Amino acid sequence: MTVQTVKILSELVSTPVDKLLAQMKDAGLPQTSASQEVSEVEKQVLLSYLKRQHGEEGDNSQRITLQRKTTSTLSRDGGKAVNVAVKKKRTYVKRDDEEAQKQEELAKRLAEEQERLAQEKARLELERKQEEEKAAKAKAEAEEKARQEAAVKNVVADAGAVNETEQYVSDTGAAEPVESPKQPKASKKVSQPAMDSKKSTVAPKGKKGPVRHDNDKDKDKPRGRVNPDNKRTSRVNVNDEDEFTRRGKLGRKNKKPSKQEHGFQKPTAKMIHEVALPESITVADLAEKMAVKGAEVIKIMFKMGAMATINQTIDRDTATLVVEEMGHTVKFIDENAVENDMIEAIDYQGEAIKRAPVVTVMGHVDHGKTSLLDYIRTTRVAAGESGGITQHIGAYHVETPHGMISFLDTPGHAAFTSMRARGAKATDIVILVCAADDGVMPQTIEAIQHARAAGVPMVVAMTKIDKEGADIDRVKNELVAQEVVPEEWGGDIQFVGVSAKSGEGIEALLEAVLLQAEVLELTAVPSAPAKGVVVEARLDRGRGSVATLLVQNGTLKKGDIVLAGLQMGRVRALLDETGKAIDSAGPSIPVEILGLDGTPEAGEEFIVVADERKAREVANFRQGKYREVRFARQHSAKLENLFSEMGKDEVRTLNVVLKADVRGSLEALIKSLTDMNTDEVKVNVVSSGVGGITETDATLALASDAVIFGFNVRADNSAKQFIERESIDLRYYSVIYNIIDDVKSALSGMLSPDLREDIKGTAEVRDVFRSPKFGLIAGCMVIEGTVYRNKQIRVLRDDVVIYEGELESLRRFKDAVNEVSRGMECGIGVKNYNDVKVGDKIEVFETVEVARTL
């Protein structure tokens, strides 16, 4: 064995001698110079030390690493040789018997698993092929059966034409058999419908092409299906219309069909849909339910005489006609199912007790309704109201010696018709106020009609009986003319004379009301969830939406979930009519609540529900339905007016942004303003709402060139600055009369003026002569008024107008003058007219514009 020194060892391991000596010293070996010898044992000691330094542990005697270096010479074209050294390093590991055994077991298990998977795959493939063959066979049988039935029908249809059939047989030699051929090879051509339908897909035998394979290993297998006899067959597809396109190149659809290709035609029977129709539906949604295009529905509607667009909302009756016209069936659905289910789930059962009556005071304006209530309540409401008139519904409850009574005070002005109608619906008894010195007035008659429409009994209070000129008998006679007959005259209505100033008759009036309430036997269930009506609603800064409710049944508590019309919310606070916080309100108690997410419409019914999620769902549904109805109404109006507006002059519009303090006053204002609309001018309420005037309202008014009306509200600071900067017209009002008068005068100014002809004078022709400069001149005598030179004239002959024009010259003697008075002679030259005769009259007139009023 060759003896190695430290120097030789350093060359073998490619390590500097100094570094190797340092490592040997650290390993505890005695070598200190490069010439000293190194034994095999010392090499192993050094190797073990180095392995420990590099983190390797354990006995690695099973591992051996071999390095080999080979040197070769590479000759280049220039004759220069290049030495090439190749170093190779390999490591061999000798595994122990236990590890080798584990590796063999693992390999064996892997082989078994692969074999099992291959068998399972083969079984699934065989089942799939069998299913495809069954499906293809079933389709082929169905097709053959259809062909047979078609052939039989053709033979039956041709049975009546015997001569033509015989001629056809003689020409062709033999008729084709009716039965389908037993051998599929008998037909060498595929029928044209089968070729056009492209329902089959054939993989041609031996044809090479970019066919998609499930596995790369299948690339060498013959294309097509292999049956159990190892015979290749072509694959037939009758299910997938695009199978061939997916498996072949684009543009290679028109391949020659094989003998096994089957024809398949789509079913041509029309699909009849059952269309579920709500109360209203858009044309687009209706078309979607019938699986047709919107244009088809519009075409049908045009044929039926109805103009429509794809986004137009139509009613259920129109939709039913369209659906039946297109051959489908109709099924009506109830959109209010969720709402009805929620209402039906509320239990109003319980012990019924007697409740206080709800009394509405109605009558003509300034007949003393609020003053009468003031005396009963011992307050001074009327003195604090703008203009001394009531402009929203007030709700109060009063404890009297005879029992509790809840009062609703309604406005008497003509603009508040809807408020009076709501007051009549929400009440049990109506006190009809009629002034003894004024008698029956228009709003008195209207209040009678509202009470009768609501089926509410009346008690007549004749006010101002202590005033001079009061005539109770006259009032009774006028009311009898309206079929309101007092008890003493044989009727069923109590008449009571009262004075709100002295208090005369007040006790008798309250007794009459409570007597009527006893007859009605009014009851309620206090333990049930509350329900009633919204009397009024407004938007209050700092508190949000404030709604005045009248509880008709049940008890309203703080924290209840209230659903009122389009709005809902949890009751955050309950306030009585004096502003005092309370925890609950029973039947017949008016109360203000905070917590709704908006201002509900006055007159809406409210209920208390247990599930907040359902309440929000119903509120959202009502809002969506309201939007649909409003859009349908607007769209219908546009279509109806489309042709009627053609040829008319443009309507002048006064744009208005309207803000009010309460919802009822806002509604009355909108109705009063829109009632002023005519064919020439109209009021367009661009925006309306409850609450103060904001910068958003001012911006909208600027964009739409509108006037801002604030009724008992004011603009905030930012809105004031914006309005002053942009010079927007802002008007504040506290009395509804003033708004109506101002708008009426503004609309009157927008009307086109009337043209009126004002006759200034008449001259009679006494002689006719010619002038070389002016032609025919009429010598006239002014018999009426004054004749002016610069005004229009008419020539009358036997009091019939024969010419209308203007004067060319007016002279007295030889001087040209501007006017000639009555009783004086003058010469008149008529412009472009030379047929003046003696006895004609020349009438001078002026067209005057006269301002119109509404």
UniProtKB/Swiss-Prot annotation:
Start and end residues of each stretch annotated as G3: 409-412
Pfam families: EF-G_D2, GTP_EFTU, IF-2, IF2_assoc, IF2_N
Feature: compositional bias, Basic and acidic residues: 128-150, 211-232
GO molecular-function term, one example from the UniProt record: translation initiation factor activity
tr-type G domain span: 354-523
Region Disordered, annotated ranges: 52-79, 128-265
Composition bias, Polar residues: 61-75
UniProt-listed InterPro entries: DNA-bd_dom_put_sf (IPR009061), EF-G-like_DII (IPR053905), IF2_assoc_dom_bac (IPR013575), IF2_II (IPR044145), IF2_N (IPR006847), P-loop_NTPase (IPR027417), Small_GTP-bd (IPR005225), T_Tr_GTP-bd_dom (IPR000795)
Domain of life the protein comes from: Bacteria
Chain intervals for the UniProt region annotation (G4): 463-466
Region of interest (G1), ranges: 363-370
Binding locations of GTP: 363-370, 409-413
Keywords: Cytoplasm, GTP-binding, Initiation factor, Nucleotide-binding, Protein biosynthesis
UniProt keyword Transport, yes or no: no
Residue ranges with Basic residues bias: 247-257
G2 as annotated region, ranges: 388-392
PROSITE patterns, sorted: G_TR_2, IF2
PANTHER family, alphabetized: TR-TYPE G DOMAIN-CONTAINING PROTEIN, TRANSLATION INITIATION FACTOR IF-2-RELATED
Record's function text: One of the essential components for the initiation of protein synthesis. Protects formylmethionyl-tRNA from spontaneous hydrolysis and promotes its binding to the 30S ribosomal subunits. Also involved in the hydrolysis of GTP during the formation of the 70S ribosomal complex.
Protein name: Translation initiation factor IF-2
Source organism (scientific name): Marinomonas sp. (strain MWYL1)
Lineage: Bacteria, Pseudomonadati, Pseudomonadota, Gammaproteobacteria, Oceanospirillales
Gene: infB
